[in-house]
Amino acid sequence: TLIDILQCLGTNLTEFFAEESDEQIVFRKDDFFVKKDTELHNTIEWIIPNAQKNMMEPILLTLESGGSTYLDVPHEGEEFGYVLQGSIQIHVGKKVYTAKKGESFYFTPHSEHYITANKTSGAKIIWVTTPPSF
């Protein structure tokens, strides 16, 4: 049968009949979507377009001095970040953690959480969530 032949070839019906599409691997600045929040003093750059349809969603977050992200409610998943510039405070539930340039953070978002920059300098971080939540 066709299924037996496809198994011998190391594929299946879905893969065999799927239309091939060119998957974009490299994304340039022109591909990014940028949103500036003047109230919270932050800028979010979605560095992978349409990442909401993927398993994880990376962003480049720039916080002005004293800037913050919005308060996020508890949800399933994982969150990871790497501080490129400055120093941040990660607020998870009632605890506050500090990370500075060259340091990273990771947590499961089972509590309300948000990030702030210190009042004297801003910060820039790569922040990745799974599943997508930005």
Q: Where are the predicted features?
A:
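Charged, helix-prone or intrinsically disordered regulatory segments positioned adjacent to compact structured domains
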Residues: 11, 21-45
